[in-house]
Regions:
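A generic helix-loop boundary/linker signal
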Residues: 16, 20, 46, 65-68
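The conserved cystathionine-beta-synthase
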Residues: 17-34, 41, 86-103, 110, ...
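A glycine-centered beta-loop-beta connector
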Residues: 30, 38-54, 99, 107-123
């Protein structure tokens, strides 16, 4: 069975967030696109972090609880800056194993520091089932 590369399976235009966006803008992007998180990309296309819906919810609830305006917080303040990523030519099955081991639902795909796409569990599941179907 031939293993696909990440490039063959990844999305090349994932929803991304701007590090300067406020938490309400980030929440709206997450809700409108029905996703659970997104990579944070600067104006040069460089991956600078990731934000989950839990990060956003935590920022809003914490601000409200403390009597502060939750709209003041920026994505850059609540994002996870240490991001696991892979390259477009990596093997899908190996990346899937890493994602499972680290309990991650999505993986940014980066080449020369620039975000090229994103790989999700659903895309991997589709690719693996297609490989099995083709082998039968």
């Amino acid at each position: 069975m031939k293993m696909a590369s990440v490039r063959d399976v990844m999305s090349t235009s994932p929803v991304t967030l701007d590090p300067d966006a406020n938490v309400y803008e980030a929440a709206n992007t997450i809700l409108v696109n029905r996703i659970s998180g997104a990579p944070v990309v600067d104006t040069d296309g460089k991956l600078v972090g990731v934000v989950s819906e839990l990060d956003i919810l935590n920022a809003i609830v914490t601000s409200v609880y403390n009597g502060a305006d939750p709209g003041i917080a920026r994505v850059s303040e609540i994002m996870t800056a240490e991001v696991e990523s892979n390259a477009p030519d990596d093997d899908v099955v190996s990346v899937a194993r890493e994602m499972l081991d680290n309990k991650r639902r999505r993986r940014p795909i980066v080449e020369d520091g620039v975000m090229k796409g994103q790989l999700t569990c659903r895309q991997i599941l589709r690719a693996v089932t297609d490989m099995v179907d083709d082998a039968q």
